[in-house]
């Protein structure tokens, strides 16, 4: 009877080891092999989220059944997945901020601070994160920047259309006794 109990325990352990192996090699995890923060695309978000859940589940449910090397490997995969998801998050946040900006046609001088803030966000992105913004984003920022510069120049020139020194006009006004 003791031998049968040991056989049952051994079978249960083997089943647990097989389940741990299956969890570590789940399709969700395999689907994101090779994806890093430096090559991730927006379309990878859903598979990465599934892989993150699968990796967290494997580590949580079977952590004690993996060797130190297997656990480290799973943790490294999880870190890679989280970094890739963070890169997507950065790109999505920047795209959302760009989307909030007015078009160049609707730009006002008061939009300069918002544009500068968004340009700072975009400047902080990696090259791959910038690539995820799409082709239109840099063009929108550049067009808006040009329009705001033109508006600033207009605001700084005298309203008469004469761009000569306004101080001379004021001096003439006082001299003429006006």
Feature annotation, model-predicted:
Residues 1-157:
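Beta-rich interaction/scaffold domains
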Residues 165-178:
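A cross-kingdom C-terminal cell-surface attachment/processing module
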């Amino acid at each position: 009877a003791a031998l049968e109990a040991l056989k049952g325990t051994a079978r249960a352990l083997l089943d647990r080891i097989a389940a741990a192996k299956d969890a570590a090699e789940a399709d969700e995890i395999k689907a994101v092999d090779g994806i890093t923060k430096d090559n991730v695309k927006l379309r990878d978000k859903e598979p990465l989220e599934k892989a993150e859940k699968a990796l967290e589940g494997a580590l949580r449910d079977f952590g004690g059944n993996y060797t130190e090397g297997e656990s480290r490997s799973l943790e490294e995969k999880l870190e890679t997945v989280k970094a890739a998801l963070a890169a997507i998050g950065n790109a999505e946040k920047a795209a959302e901020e760009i989307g909030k900006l007015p078009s160049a046609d609707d730009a006002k001088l008061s939009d300069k601070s918002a544009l500068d803030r968004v340009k700072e966000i975009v400047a902080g992105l990696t090259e791959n994160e910038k690539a995820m913004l799409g082709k239109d984003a840099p063009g929108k920022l550049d067009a808006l920047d040009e329009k705001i510069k033109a508006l600033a120049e207009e605001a700084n020139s005298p309203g008469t259309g004469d761009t000569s020194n306004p101080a001379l006009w004021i001096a003439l006004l006082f001299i003429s006794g006006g």
